[in-house]
């Protein structure tokens, strides 16, 4: 077998494979064995049909089977090439003692990574975030430690109402009966709850609702109305929250520490996402238009199979505009992936089995299974293992890059305006 490079366009390479007589003879023998298990020719026992008879009776079809077996030799020649698309056969022919196959391969494109320090990400002011967090948590604690006093008057904003809700179908059959408690807010507009405003203990509210063409009656009986008194913000509140606290300041410090843990995790993830979004801006890539065209067509065909194409395209000026945007998104995704791959290799970043197990344990609650089951699942499934490996690798590379980017400290949302922030790096 001879392999010749016929054409190269950036990451797209056209290869010609020429097979000799010996390779063709071996492929023909495989075709004979394969066909003998599947075809019947009058006058010959199944499985005993000679090669010359199969070639004569099947003609071009036999040649196609022979070419199929010859092509089984091609993958080994490509194993050292990192491909982003499956090889595409553009030509193949078999003549006498020579066979020729032309294959188009699309390799991972080369990238040139620019100055990471030119990327700017935003970080919300930590001190102000924690200040607001502590304030909010203290209000939550006041709400949860409110003193309840039964009242005779009608329910109003701030009160807690306990009701027994019964649900009946159109035939009057009771389907469910359950107790609920609601705290009535200012400008209450929640379904059912808004109907409790002004009601007293013993009052009954009936509400008709229709779901999927069926009518239901909801009967809410007010069992009790409570006036809620929120505790004052002070040392006594701290003591009621936890007997380890003697003062309000101790409670605030504990809440601040709690908020800091949440802040660190969420802010790191936010900065990773910002960095990932902006990475394509500093990356130059050598990729063929043909590669992008194939990837765009594959994405569109996938959307069509899922029945989502028409709906998505309808939000664009034209199909061409959609194709252009899809092409840009795919190009940016390739840039991001290649940067992660290249930098991971350059920096010697990898993912070991212990890290995969830890990731599986952390994801187990979200998957609704035990940590041991999650680890077993990851070991058993190569696709899942690779998915987690890539997620961890990407996180590691991004965390390394975050040490080089510009960080702009900004106000928490809802505070101030769009004024300039301050740089943290």
From Swiss-Prot:
| DNA damage listed as a keyword | no
**SUPFAM superfamilies membership:** FKBP-like (SSF54534), Triger factor/SurA peptide-binding domain-like (SSF109998), Trigger factor ribosome-binding domain (SSF102735)
Tell me which residues make up the PPIase FKBP-type domain.
Answer: 158-231
Q: What is its main location?
A: cytoplasm
Where in the cell?
Cytoplasm
Catalysed reaction equations from the record? [protein]-peptidylproline (omega=180) = [protein]-peptidylproline (omega=0)
Q: What EC number(s) does the entry state?
A: 5.2.1.8
Q: Biological process (GO) annotations? A: 'de novo' cotranslational protein folding; cell division; chaperone-mediated protein folding; protein transport; protein unfolding; regulation of DNA-templated transcription elongation
Gene Ontology MF terms? DNA binding; peptidyl-prolyl cis-trans isomerase activity; protein folding chaperone; ribosome binding
Alphabetically sorted, this entry's keywords are: Cell cycle, Cell division, Chaperone, Cytoplasm, Isomerase, Rotamase
Q: Which GO terms describe its cellular component?
A: cytoplasm
Q: Give the protein's biological function.
A: Involved in protein export. Acts as a chaperone by maintaining the newly synthesized protein in an open conformation. Functions as a peptidyl-prolyl cis-trans isomerase.
Notes concerning its domains: Consists of 3 domains; the N-terminus binds the ribosome, the middle domain has PPIase activity, while the C-terminus has intrinsic chaperone activity on its own.
NCBIfam families on file: tig (TIGR00115)
| Protein name (database record) | Trigger factor
| Gene for this chain | tig
